[in-house]
Amino acid sequence: MALQGPIPVEFGLVFPAGVYAAGAFEPVRDFEASASGRFVQSKDKATGVPLWVVEVIDADHTARARTVKVKVAAQAQPVLPAGPAGSPFVPVEFTGLTVTPYVNQAGRLGYSLKASGIRAPGRPPGRPGPEGRESAA
């Protein structure tokens, strides 16, 4: 089969109504390497770069899952773009988005989402934002 591993997808195809970050990025725990209270951060299998995860809220009111976790590989903790003043939710877009299908413990098809970077919505790829650079891996 020609398709193996993560499948590249456009952000708008996965999230046509956009998403809102519901908190900051957290390190992904490597459950096999972490033991007896010792935390080990998971690394990207292809690059060896540390993995971070952020929970996002799908703005599509018809979406089956309202919240989704998206992983980003980056040497340092990614920073969310500035959001609207006074709002706990930050609109974001992911760059270099991939989806990896898998069968979950209940025997149902699930999807893992991973991105190479994050930015404010509506900004063309590679164009710096107000912070002067695109947050990415």
Predicted regions and their residues:
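OB-fold and OB-like single-stranded nucleic-acid-recognition modules
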Residues: M1-A137
